[in-house]
Amino acid sequence: MNTANASLPPRGALRYLSLCVLTTLYSPLATASEPEPVTTLQTITFNARQYTPAKQTENVRHDSSVKVQQADLLNQYLPTVAGVNVGGTSGMDQHIYIRGLGSDNAGSALKITVDGVRQPETRGFHHAGISGLDPDLYKTTEVSVGNNSVTLGNNAIGGGVAFTTVDAQDLLLPDQKMGAKVKLGYASNDQQFQRSLTTYAKPNDQLDMIVSYSERDSDGGEDGKSNHIQGDDITIKNILAKVNVMPAEGHKITASYQSYDNDGNYPFRPNIGYQANLPANIHPGYTNNETYALGYEYKPHSNFELNSKIYHLTNESLSQGLRGTTPMRIATSGKTDGMTASIKQQLTQHHGDHALTHTLNYGVEGYKKSATLESSDITEDATSVGVYLQDRIELGRFALTPGVRFDHYKPSERLSSDDYNQLSGALAGEFKLTPNHSLFASYTQLFNGPPLPETIHQSGQTFVNKDLEAETGANAELGISSRFQGVFDSQDSMSLTAKVFDTQYDNKIDRLTGIDCATGNTVTGGQCASYINAGETTVKGYELSAKYRLNNMRLNAGYAHAKSETEQGYQLNKDSGDQLNLGFNYDINDKFSLGSAIRHVKGLTRRTSATAVADLPSFTTYDVFGSYRPSALPQLTVDAGVYNLTDAYYYEHVSNTGDKAMGRNVKVALSYQF
């Protein structure tokens, strides 16, 4: 039995609190006609579609530039969140990173879900991505920048990203019982042509349903120097089908199906870029995900909510090409079967003139993941079960949130003869200095069971380290949040947030190559790879954000800094330079809206070993976009924009240096709703 230390004292106190104030916070994600996005102490929520105010629920929904930009990849909108980067240019190589941690060849450090369904956590091939995700299907994206809650659990030491898909009630116009939306889009750089049809209905209060199909064709596109990128003859298809049944007051049953299919001629090693794979390593490849889910919700009143879900996800991928002079065909498959159940309950006690409120959040999550290399008979799997209890206690201006979680993680016998058990705790606090100014702090213990090896290395190319320890650690944060009214004008408002963080990781897992396949030792000419515990790693930094609004105008800005240091004095290989985001949005009237965005990433010298030093250049991108809805045809919306306006030639710091980003891109989309 391998039992991780359940009591991890903080090693390294937070030494500073940055109170830098910016006059604007980046988020071209909102328009003045809708309320602010939901921003809690540790979680950012924003939306990717347009909704009528009458349909708003707990998460405040609003217009966002995701719709205007017609984002088809995560890298086109997620980096607007301070502390978040997305590597990979194509849909075959998308990787989310939060403060330098994400989905890499050492496993996944982020919990990524769609409608509560955990996405695949194991790569088929270390040069490719984990899963395909399409922003066009989502209505909200919730980003946990860092792990600050016992609710996240295993495979979430860096935080999490939760996508939620659209429902019929989100799209129905006032007084409609059924409707449809047709969308046509074109992007100039990769000559992408998009078409989609979404139908939805709510015939009565007991039933609503939605079916959506979209398809995109493209040829890959070019970088800022007119070099071809991504691939050729690419077709991406998406299907979403969802039915909600409300058999009685407070009860809801949801059945859903999602499918993502990406097929095209792709580089054998997508992450090193198209040009580096020429001339012989461009071949047909694909990735496909299918998800079936069944959920139940019980909400008899506003103080009690139960949510449960069971799901089955399958994924397949194919990469083929030459490894040296040897032809390779890497066909992989995997599946994840899981269940979740959680309860949120609010209890209030009155003590004289004071009210003591408990908001309880408790639940269980279990899932089994497996991965298979089709050319072998080996399947690796792992099972994870976690239970948690969290209580937010509010009294006057004080709020305290203790939490506790127990995780049990069991990989297959071939990987380890042990199981892993971890008892983790968390404590967060908030103090309202005034109704508009709050201090907050949190401390969360972390756990991440050893990952399944990438599927390709199940064919004898991995030395199995059965002594691998689980990753553990702790994340501490401290910050201040303020809101102001009437700053420069009686009608304006401003919000400011600043926080610092200090995250310690023990037994950080890393993947090494050049390993002797028999002994596991590092040798010259070693043909195997292996996973090791590389020791302690520290990530420290700060994130600043602000938001200004005056009538129909918004100015926004955000700044993020994170720096890692390993036990050997080096950095993580996905450290990124400091990032500044600026944005402007203006609703001219109910027909026209305009926006712009600037993103600057500072240059960085990244040293990951004694001999590996990379000088990563800075880059700046500029976007302009707008939307028009003609009075004579209000059901029609025209969205247009120019992205990477200056045709900058660059690569993301979390991408391979050869994986260049897309150059200037002009997008136009027509949407008709009836």
Model regions and ranges:
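N-terminal periplasmic "start-of-domain" segments of outer-membrane beta-barrel proteins
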Residues: L41-Q69, Q94-H95
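Extracytoplasmic beta-strand/coil segments of soluble accessory domains associated
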Residues: N75-V117
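Short acidic/polar hinge/loop motifs at secondary-structure boundaries
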Residues: R118-N147
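Outer-membrane beta-barrel translocator/receptor signature
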Residues: L137-T140, V145, V150-K225, D232-I239
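Membrane-embedded beta-barrel scaffold of Gram-negative outer-membrane proteins
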Residues: L184, K299, E305-G321, L439-F440, ...
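Flexible loop and strand-edge segments within Gram-negative outer membrane beta-barrel domains
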Residues: G220, G224-S226, Q230-D232, I236, ...
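Surface-exposed extracellular loop regions of Gram-negative outer-membrane beta-barrel proteins
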Residues: D261-N265, R269-Q275, K410, F431-E477, ...
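Gram-negative outer-membrane beta-barrel transporters
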Residues: H358-L360, L395-L400, S493-Q504, V523-S609, ...
